[in-house]
A protein has these predicted regions:
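Structural motif
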Residues: 16-24
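Short alpha-helix plus adjacent loop in nuclease-associated cores
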Residues: 66-86
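Glycine-rich phosphate-binding "P-loop"
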Residues: 2-16
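Acidic/histidine-rich catalytic cores and adjacent linkers
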Residues: 3-5, 22, 28-60, 64-68, ...
Length: 229
């Protein structure tokens, strides 16, 4: 992660894409066994690929993806509650934002809506608490204790989407907790994906996948090409 460069690009989002990457590494006097850390979302295909082809690597599940899934659970609660309380219409982004990113008007609306809907208010506070563990904890064991307490709260929350999120969290626990050892996120790859999508828009689509991959190497990294005079 020191150089933050795209070293390999290939079509596909399944295990075979990771397998091809591991094979490509072998062609460059390296070994897949040298990969010791991998950051990813919770795609079953990626998990299987990394486990099978990077056997020495510890998997870190991206913390932003974890919070994204929790936001989806909160939004599910909001949609259900809106059917009962129409006042919640148009409030989606208020619940998805952190307090420091709300406008004064949104902040006031959040306070009012929180008083009127205890379920959403509880879910929102649970999100802030989980984020605080990520933000303020630097020790692996302290994070473990914090996560266990949070999960106990979530399981007893009586909020279906939150309880389902907690079940997912538990089933991926080791990889989520691994963040406090590796401190890896998928932030760089997400930023690179944005640049790749911009390349695609600029070109109005690529018919040749190999040409597109070449453009990724050139346009989505800070590759310095030699100049000739």
């Amino acid at each position: 992660m020191l150089n933050r460069e795209v070293v390999y690009a290939a079509p596909g989002k399944d295990e075979s894409a990771i397998e091809r990457f591991s094979e490509e590494i072998e062609k460059h006097n390296a070994s897949s066994e040298q990969i010791t850390n991998v950051s990813m979302d919770m795609s079953p295909a990626y998990i299987k690929g990394a486990s099978n082809h990077f056997r020495n690597a510890d998997i870190t599940f991206d913390k932003f993806h974890v919070i994204k899934l929790l936001n989806e659970a909160i939004d599910e609660i909001r949609r259900t509650e809106t059917a009962v309380n129409p006042c919640l219409k148009g409030s989606r982004y208020i619940w998805l934002k952190n307090p420091e990113h709300l406008t004064v008007r949104q902040s006031n609306a959040l306070k009012t809506l929180s008083k009127e809907n205890r379920k959403l208010s509880k879910a929102y506070q649970m999100k802030l608490t989980l984020q605080d563990i990520y933000r303020t904890t630097h020790d692996y064991h302290v994070a473990d204790v914090g996560f266990q307490k949070w999960l106990s709260w979530a399981v007893r929350s009586r909020l279906g989407p939150i309880k389902r999120f907690a079940k997912m969290f538990k089933s991926h626990y080791d990889g989520i907790l691994q963040y406090f050892k590796s401190h890896l996120t998928a932030g760089f790859s997400e930023g690179t994906n944005s640049r790749i999508q911009e390349l695609k828009r600029m070109s109005k689509g690529f018919r040749n996948i190999n040409y597109f991959i070449s453009m990724i190497y050139l346009g989505a990294t800070d590759l310095v090409l030699p100049s000739y005079t």
